[in-house]
Regions:
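N-terminal non-cleavable signal-anchor helices
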Residues: 96, 100, 112, 148-149
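A generic structural signal for beta-strand entry/edge sites
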Residues: 1-2, 39
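Short hydrophobic short-linear motifs embedded
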Residues: 37, 145-153
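Catalytic-site neighborhood detector that most strongly recognizes the C-terminal catalytic loop/helix
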Residues: 2-13, 25, 48, 93, ...
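Short, basic (Lys/Arg/His-rich) helix/loop patches that form interaction surfaces
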Residues: 12, 18, 26-50, 58-102, ...
């Protein structure tokens, strides 16, 4: 599956196609079962006066604050820290730093960013598949999961 993030929804103004690994698709489908058959994976619970059918930007931080209140020994973190966690996991998995940055839709700076227009879709797909395997193993509590770095392709 592919999730298309249009330019008007991305922080850097660049559209991106994000390859979704099978576990991510399964997690999204599981979330959708709670949506009462709406078009949204995360619908609004109440329409109220704002008249938008999906959750507000503040919903996840509010939910996270409730979870954090139950975990006083865990250092403070924000929703944005999940991106840092993803980037850290990709590094631990041996994903090329350039590919990992593109997984986060970060712009490449300097001359490299000007001349290199490759979207790295296949490389991002492989990286995100490996990350999904790690997350699935962690979700299942498998202590036997072994992180095996991706081998770099010869150019």
């Amino acid at each position: 599956a592919i999730w298309h993030l249009p330019e008007e929804r991305s922080k850097n103004g660049d559209a991106i196609d994000i390859p979704l690994p099978p576990p991510a698709v399964a997690w999204l489908r599981e979330l959708h079962t709670f949506s009462c058959n709406t078009a949204w994976v995360l619908p609004a619970r109440k329409m109220q006066s704002r008249m938008i059918p999906h959750i507000q930007e503040s919903t996840l931080p509010v939910a996270l604050a409730k979870v954090r209140a139950e975990m006083p020994d865990v250092p403070n973190f924000t929703i944005h820290d999940f991106r840092r966690t993803a980037r850290t996991h990709l590094a631990a998995l041996g994903v090329d730093p350039f590919v990992a940055e593109r997984c986060l839709n970060h712009k490449v700076k300097g001359v490299e960013g000007i001349y290199n227009r490759h979207d790295y879709f296949d490389e991002r797909k492989a990286a995100l598949n490996e990350w999904a395997k790690l997350l699935k193993a962690l979700e299942e509590g498998r202590p036997d999961y072994n992180v095996v770095p991706l081998k770099k392709k010869a150019l």
